[in-house]
């Protein structure tokens, strides 16, 4: 299966009605992540061959709880499993040696 990959995508928790995020949007650059398999982040690929936003309804759309598997926050920030979140993966890269993978909040979240 082949997919057309956008150069970048902007992820915004502002999409959730009634929620005011504390941090700004995140623009994800696919080019910097081309050595990572799509299904590493888009876990529905092997089953449905569709690529949806991480915050699609029914996937990671829980904005109230930070620890639930459906949590928007956990999806991007957990450090318990380096293969399951942005921060976890970036932290693992830094642990392995010099890396320019961002870890500071404002490195990804633009106000």
UniProtKB/Swiss-Prot annotation:
One of its GO terms (biological process) is anaerobic respiration. Heme c 2 binds at residues 43, 54, 59-60. Binds 4 heme c groups covalently per monomer. InterPro entries: Cyt_c_III (IPR002322), Cyt_c_III_dom (IPR020942), Multihaem_cyt_sf (IPR036280). Its cofactor is heme c. Heme c 1 binds at residues 30, 38, 41-42. GO terms for molecular function: electron transfer activity; heme binding; metal ion binding. It is found in: Periplasm. Heme c 4 binds at residues 77, 105, 108-109. This is Cytochrome c3, 26 kDa. The lineage of its organism: Bacteria, Pseudomonadati, Thermodesulfobacteriota, Desulfovibrionia, Desulfovibrionales.
